[in-house]
Amino acid sequence: SPCEADVCVVQFNAGWNSGNDVEWHGKLKDCEIKYIDIAAYPDVASKYEIVVVPTIVVFNGKEVKRFQADISFAIAATKSEVQEVVDGILMDQF
């Protein structure tokens, strides 16, 4: 995972698509938040097989789930859907 913490949510996007940045990404709780510009880090994009931006990937050491944009380069997933995945990981740790 590209993160320091175990539980981490990464938004992969590109500068040219910044109008479709996922605004609520930084408001997720109980996880590390990371933003990676694939235009600046193409090697990271290929390592994680990012084919469309934005893509949000939830990691718990390794990839747990990904949410990908549709053909309009926007993500349909909601903050609560992604937070649910994070909460599920944390619940499993107890």
Short names for language-model regions:
Residues 38-46:
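N-terminal post-signal-peptidase region of extra-cytosolic proteins
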Residues 1-34:
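Local sequence-structure signature of Cys/Sec-based thiol-disulfide redox active-site neighborhoods
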Residues 23-26, 49-51, 72:
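Short, glycine/charged-enriched secondary-structure capping and boundary segments
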Residues 10, 34-36, 57-58, 66:
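Ordered hydrophobic segments in well-structured contexts
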Residues 15-18, 40-41, 63-64, 72-73:
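Solvent-exposed loop/turn segments at secondary-structure junctions
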Residues 48-59:
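Structural micro-motif
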